[in-house]
A protein has these predicted regions:
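Generic beta-strand/beta-sheet core signal
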Residues: 1-3, 7-8, 30-32, 44, ...
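Catalytic adenosine-cofactor/nucleotide-binding cores of aminoacyl-tRNA synthetases and other
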Residues: 3-88, 190-191, 233-235
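Short runs of predominantly hydrophobic/aromatic residues within well-ordered alpha helices
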Residues: 15, 27, 52, 56, ...
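Acidic, turn-prone loop/beta-hairpin segments
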Residues: 73-107, 139-234
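Conserved short loop/turn motifs at secondary-structure junctions
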Residues: 44-49, 126-127, 151-160
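Extended, non-catalytic structural segments that build the interaction scaffolds
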Residues: 12, 42-49, 104-125, 170, ...
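Core structural elements
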Residues: 32, 53-67, 92-105, 122-145, ...
Length: 235
């Protein structure tokens, strides 16, 4: 519910104190994620350290996951791209599903930013990062990445290409909200340019959108969620 900030009630937050205690990018992202142009904002440091922190932490750890595994596998990020995988007909259903989700996220974030609906844009980034990339794609491809069979190397490189494309796009999409974090992650992992500010804004590729595979995956994920909930209830 919240109360109005007032000096007399002693609930005013000093910006310098807030930024001494919490990362500036986390505070920035929280405000953009939380703020609606038509609603008052109930500020909570507890909420700040919950979902917004999880979003930035997940983004960081997937970059780390990609870096550790791709370097071990000697993956060349400039040679093995999504186009390479697509042209050689090496995309699995999971790859196609994630790429399709990514194109829609690009379109949605671009539209919402142009309409100054930044809180909805931040939520769209959250949805793709957490619900699609982190909770579905990474888990279902993990065993393939950890298969050291040399004959499966191309498959592993396809997965790296998909993750790299997703992360690079997310870095640019989230940059207006969390510039220091995205700059660090981009230059550490990709470094195509001296700064992420020199990157172009992502554009969706309609040819990568696949409605039928998206629908099939969404149904499958719903079934898995229901089964998991039933299993937890039965314990």
């Amino acid at each position: 519910k919240g109360n109005k900030m007032s000096k007399s009630t002693g609930n005013v937050l000093d910006a310098s104190d807030l930024l001494d205690k919490y990362p500036v990018d986390l505070v920035r992202f929280y405000f953009m994620w939380k703020s609606s142009p038509i609603e008052t904002l109930n500020f909570s440091t507890k909420e700040l350290m919950s979902r917004p922190y999880q979003i930035l932490s997940t983004l960081f750890h997937i970059h780390l996951y990609f870096k550790q595994n791709s370097e071990y596998d000697k993956f060349n990020i400039n040679e093995k791209t999504v186009d390479w995988a697509k042209d050689n007909d090496m995309l699995s259903s999971a790859d196609i599903w994630l790429l399709s989700k990514l194109q829609k996220t690009i379109e949605l974030c671009t539209k919402l930013n142009n309409e100054c609906k930044f809180h909805e844009s931040a939520s769209a980034i959250e949805d793709f990062l957490i619900n699609s990339l982190s909770q579905i794609y990474i888990p279902i491809t993990k065993q393939e990445l950890w298969n050291d069979d040399e004959t499966k190397k191309n498959r592993r490189h396809v997965i790296y290409a998909i993750i790299a494309e997703s992360l690079k796009t997310l870095d640019v999409l989230i940059h207006p909200f969390s510039p220091f974090t995205s700059e660090y992650l981009y230059t550490t992992i990709f470094g195509d340019k001296k700064s992420i500010l020199l990157e172009s804004w992502p554009k969706s590729t309609p040819a990568l959108v696949n409605e039928s595979i998206e629908e099939s995956f969404d149904i499958m994920n719903e079934i898995v969620s229901v089964c998991a909930a039933a299993r937890m209830k039965g314990k």
